[in-house]
Amino acid sequence: MGDLKSLMPKKLGFGCMRLPVIGEDTAKIDDKAFCEMVDKYLEQGFCYFDTAYPYHNEQSEEAVKRCIVNRYPREQFFLADKMPVWNVKKTEDYDRIFEEQKRRCGVSYFDFYLLHAMDKARVEETERLGGFERLAERRKAGEIKHLGFSFHDSADVLEEILSNHPELEFVQLQINYYDWDSESVQSRKCYETAVRHNVPVIVMEPVKGGTLANLIGKPEKILKKLDDKATPASFAIRFAASLDNVMLVLSGMSDMEQLLDNTSYMREFQPLNEEEKDAIVRVVDELHKIPTIPCTKCRYCVEGCPKKIVIPSVFDAYNFSVQFGVNEKTRKGYENAVQEHGKASDCIHCGKCESQCPQHLEIRKLLEDVAKTFEDGTPDK
């Protein structure tokens, strides 16, 4: 544990899943803006970039090559990538995809490499196809420096994986103060499981897809009373980074403003003090009183939707209406979300989205709520 943690000069990683884009097309990454963010991030002593095969409609890895790999010495940064296990149908696919990722990123090795979004079913399939052994061979060959996995399942399943696969050096977990005691996400239980196995943790979704960066009302006031200059996001990221077994916290930064804010308090990181911890407990109590949809905007649900509903955008509009009321502005937000895509009422209840959701949301039922709010109707069943 100590060795991996000591590799990180600072505890903030740059997640490349919500990069600046041109217009509304997530596949059209704004290279100029991304390069400027990369430069500012690296010049402050940060060095960890996290990408993955599906991010930005499979364009994130190529953007990493253009804006980082082609512009900086390889030893100046750590690069993490992930095996999209859902795309693996036969053993040879591990090699094919890995080679494709090296080509996309323009590298000969990855500093950190993860099996992506593992759960019980995917672990069993990876074992059946020999995926753990295949990637261990890549590590032995020097093409992977450190091998781990990102995880979306129960603490019991995590216990099973770590017991059966001691060759895995780290785990990437969803940890934020809202989900800390959640029975569905099980952030605390999963973290404590990793601690028992002496496996260091990389944190994803510390701001819960932006939810904890946009507090209003009483939750916002509680934090402002502590420090009226600190952003809500700063408390969320510092909460995760304050955990002893956390080696790194990822933030999917979309613009320079977010990057400058995050780096300002993570440059010389200070763990939360007791007063701040108590305040966060009160914030969570208040948040649980607001019935928003806890979507993290990972977009795993979008690709397979037969009605082309952009579910995260639809949920965003709904959450905004819960917080600010149904008015011209919130209705416009919903109209923009469905302008070139399916409406909430177009849902045919096939359930494909729910099988892909790491948050285990009842998406079909939630789409009914959205339709009632914005369309004065309910989805056809």
Name what the model sees in each region:
Residues 27-41, 89-105, 153-162, 232-239:
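Short, acidic/polar
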Residues 18-32, 82-92, 121-124, 220-230:
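Active-site mouth loops of central-metabolism enzymes
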Residues 1-77, 134, 140:
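N-terminal binding-site loop/beta-alpha segment at the start of enzyme catalytic domains
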Residues 323-350, 376-381:
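Short Fe-S-cluster ligation motifs
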Residues 4-8, 43, 65-76, 99-108, ...:
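Acidic (Asp/Glu)-rich catalytic clusters
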Residues 103-122:
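Active-site groove signature of glycoside hydrolases
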Residues 292-308, 343-360:
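Local cysteine-cluster metal-coordination motifs and their immediate loop/turn environment
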Residues 118-296, 300-309, 313-316, 326-332, ...:
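Beta/alpha (TIM)-barrel catalytic core signal, keyed to glycine-rich beta->alpha loops juxtaposed to Asp/Glu
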